């Protein structure tokens, strides 16, 4: 189970990066949700194996360069997803167990890009993207080009509000027609178009593309008592507020609202992908609190994926950086969610066998919103002695024999000299989350590799201007930019380098956790497996993978070559202080604090080494209780958990 949890964590984190950071989803919503729910189930059954970088413990995406980073004063959370009436009823039961008289506000889930707007004395100061929930991108100048966002409010308030920026279907169609005429790549969907627009460095482009917004939340403290009052105030202040919502205490009425909206979603001028249900009382919201990732007082019902039939014409097999061989089906073109689809993932050999997918089959292809399609199943009634799919025995890149480990669902090439494996590893090293070498994408990497200029990541730092100039299509100016990007990458903090090495099970967050303890890449050459396994959030699988990598002679040589080239080996963040007063304690805040707001208290606790969570359990070490503390305080007392007040916290 531990191994499966790790596999799911790594896979889902890769999909999250593609979705949130690159705005280029690589898996369907349905497939992602299926894997995510499997991970949630396993983590609930085996909580001791939950990893620090699990997507169940995270929000949103990572940060692209090009805009200044912006730390949100009030974090942005994701929402818990629901896909059935039963899950909504379970949510209702949990809420009503604490607040029998709770009412809900159901709002449309706009398929756009989350934004945060901060005003001082009524004037817009900062517009930012969500990013990872704590740090986003400052896109203020682009935000000012969206016509329905007021630069000055109708009242001189200091306030932070949240909402969604989107592109209407009409604007999306016009933009894609213009891009087609100009020979440019068309946007896949309105969400991608909106995301790409907000990241434009040329603000005039933003103005031309006619984005719009719907605001739905006051993140800063508000005098309003109910969510529907918040929407009314936002409208009074001059913001656009979506007119479709329903206030009720009945889940039957909410379900009727969902079905009504689902039936008319194609008639709307913009894309939606579900309905969000929130506890209407803000006081109840505060008492219900948050999990690590999501509020306990809200849930997002997501509409089912759209499905179409297509015929499988052939299958391509490609090798990834870890050697995993992935099948992709070539299809008869079909229109799906507003785009023409001619390729779909088949996931892995076990999936093909389970579904009995064959060449020539008519299959169901599905795609939710802006997600790359996948094959759901075969239409058996249309099968007519189709060709059984031949599973490759040899690597399509190097010809080596493929292996299928018992505990894995994928075929894998284990030849370290496989050209595709090397190229994918180089691409990963240069990617944004790793060393962020701008311009060094797949096409350039392939040319460098085929020319014999690079065979491992250390070779990147030996490249010269003359090397680049020998490649087709590379001019002097491009060569200079590439060399500058390579040089700039040398000063990255070491966790980006560790992640860039592509060690199995070592993601970006795990890299940071490791280096918070060890401080330097060189120290990992002699790190002991049992020491690494003791780091909170890691465990034996990660520890074994890391030590196996650094025990190789080639790893020591590579580290030495990178160090000689001037690549930074040192972690620039704050190392873990095991002497902090509350180091290692799990703490819960409950009730109303008089001197500190919630975020200030949370920051103080984390600075003291504590981990702050939203619910009381047997794992909780300490509860900080303010006035009017409710069920969390009672539960803490029943479990015999240590309880302190705000004055105790302020003494530190």
Swiss-Prot record:
It is an enzyme of class 6 (ligase). Residues 577-652 form the BRCT domain. GO terms for molecular function: DNA binding; DNA ligase (NAD+) activity; metal ion binding. Its cofactor is Mg(2+); Mn(2+). Zn(2+) binds at residues 395, 398, 413, 418. GO terms for cellular component: cytosol. Keywords: DNA damage, DNA repair, DNA replication, Ligase, Magnesium, Manganese, Metal-binding, NAD, Zinc. Its EC number is 6.5.1.2. SMART domains: BRCT, HhH1, LIGANc. Pfam families: BRCT, DNA_ligase_aden, DNA_ligase_OB, DNA_ligase_ZBD, HHH_2, HHH_5. It comes from the Bacteria. One of its GO terms (biological process) is DNA replication. The active site is at 109 (n6-amp-lysine intermediate). NAD(+) binds at residues 29-33, 78-79, 107, 130, 164, 278, 302. It catalyses: NAD(+) + (deoxyribonucleotide)n-3'-hydroxyl + 5'-phospho-(deoxyribonucleotide)m = (deoxyribonucleotide)n+m + AMP + beta-nicotinamide D-nucleotide. InterPro entries: BRCT_dom, BRCT_dom_sf, DisA/LigA_HHH, DNA_ligase, DNA_ligase_AS, DNA_ligase_CS, DNAligase_adenylation, DNAligase_N. HAMAP family: DNA_ligase_A. DNA ligase that catalyzes the formation of phosphodiester linkages between 5'-phosphoryl and 3'-hydroxyl groups in double-stranded DNA using NAD as a coenzyme and as the energy source for the reaction. It is essential for DNA replication and repair of damaged DNA. Belongs to the NAD-dependent DNA ligase family. LigA subfamily. This is DNA ligase. It comes from Streptococcus pyogenes serotype M6 (strain ATCC BAA-946 / MGAS10394).
């Amino acid at each position: 189970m531990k191994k499966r949890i790790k596999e799911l964590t790594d896979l889902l984190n890769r999909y999250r990066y593609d979705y949130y950071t690159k705005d280029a989803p690589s898996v369907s919503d349905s497939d992602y949700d299926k894997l995510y729910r499997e991970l949630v189930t396993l983590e609930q059954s085996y909580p001791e194996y939950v990893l620090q970088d699990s997507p169940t413990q995270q929000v949103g995406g990572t940060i692209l360069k090009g805009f200044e980073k912006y730390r949100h004063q009030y974090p942005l959370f994701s929402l818990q997803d629901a896909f059935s009436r039963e899950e909504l009823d379970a949510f209702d039961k949990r809420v009503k167990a604490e607040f029998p008289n709770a009412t809900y506000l159901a709002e449309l889930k706009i398929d756009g890009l989350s934004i945060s707007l901060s005003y001082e004395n009524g004037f817009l100061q900062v517009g930012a993207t969500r990013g990872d929930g704590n740090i986003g991108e400052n896109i203020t100048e682009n935000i000012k080009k969206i016509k329905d966002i007021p630069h000055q409010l109708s009242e001189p308030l200091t306030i932070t509000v949240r909402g969604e920026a989107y592109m209407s279907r009409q604007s999306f169609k016009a933009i894609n027609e213009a891009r087609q005429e100009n020979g440019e790549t068309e946007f896949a969907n309105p969400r991608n178009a909106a995301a790409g627009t907000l990241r434009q460095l040329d603000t005039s482009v933003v103005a031309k593309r006619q984005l719009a917004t719907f605001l739905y939340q006051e993140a800063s403290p508000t005098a309003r008592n109910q969510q529907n009052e918040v929407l009314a105030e936002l409208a009074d202040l001059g913001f656009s507020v979506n007119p479709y919502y329903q206030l009720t205490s009945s889940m039957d009425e909410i379900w009727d609202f969902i079905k009504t909206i689902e039936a008319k979603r194609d008639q709307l001028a913009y894309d939606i992908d579900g309905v969000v249900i929130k506890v209407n009382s803000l006081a109840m919201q505060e008492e219900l609190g948050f999990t690590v990732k999501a509020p306990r007082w809200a849930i997002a019902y997501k509409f089912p994926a759209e499905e179409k039939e297509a015929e499988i014409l052939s299958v391509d097999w490609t090798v990834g950086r870890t050697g995993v061989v992935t099948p992709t089906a070539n299809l008869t073109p079909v229109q799906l969610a507003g785009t023409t689809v001619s390729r779909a993932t088949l996931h892995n050999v076990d999936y093909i066998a389970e579904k009995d997918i064959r060449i020539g089959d008519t299959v169901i292809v599905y795609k939710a919103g802006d997600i790359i399609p996948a094959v759901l199943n075969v239409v058996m009634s249309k099968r007519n002695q189709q060709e059984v799919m031949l599973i490759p025995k040899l690597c399509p890149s190097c010809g080596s024999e493929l292996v299928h480990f018992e505990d894995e669902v994928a075929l894998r090439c284990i030849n370290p000299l496989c050209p595709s494996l090397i190229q994918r590893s180089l691409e990963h090293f240069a990617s944004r989350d790793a060393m962020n070498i701008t311009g060094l994408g797949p096409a350039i990497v392939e040319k460098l590799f085929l020319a014999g200029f690079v065979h491992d990541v250390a070779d990147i730092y030996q490249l010269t201007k003359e090397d680049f100039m020998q490649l087709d299509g590379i001019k002097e100016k491009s060569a200079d930019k590439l060399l500058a990007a390579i040089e700039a990458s040398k000063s990255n903090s070491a966790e980006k380098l560790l992640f860039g090495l592509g060690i199995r099970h070592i993601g970006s967050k795990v890299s940071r956790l490791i280096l918070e303890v060890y401080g330097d890449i060189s120290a990992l050459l002699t790190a002991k497996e049992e020491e690494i396994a003791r780091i909170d959030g890691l465990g034996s699988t990660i520890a074994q993978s890391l030590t196996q990598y650094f025990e190789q002679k080639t790893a020591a040589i590579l580290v030495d070559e990178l160090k000689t080239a001037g690549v930074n080996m040192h972690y620039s963040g704050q190392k873990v202080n095991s002497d902090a007063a509350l180091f290692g304690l799990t703490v819960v805040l409950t009730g109303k604090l008089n001197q500190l707001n919630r975020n200030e208290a949370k920051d103080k606790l984390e600075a003291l080494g504590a981990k702050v969570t939203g619910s009381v359990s047997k794992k909780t070490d300490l509860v900080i209780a303010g006035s009017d503390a409710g069920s969390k305080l009672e539960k803490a007392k029943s479990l015999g958990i240590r309880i302190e007040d705000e004055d105790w916290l302020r003494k530190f």
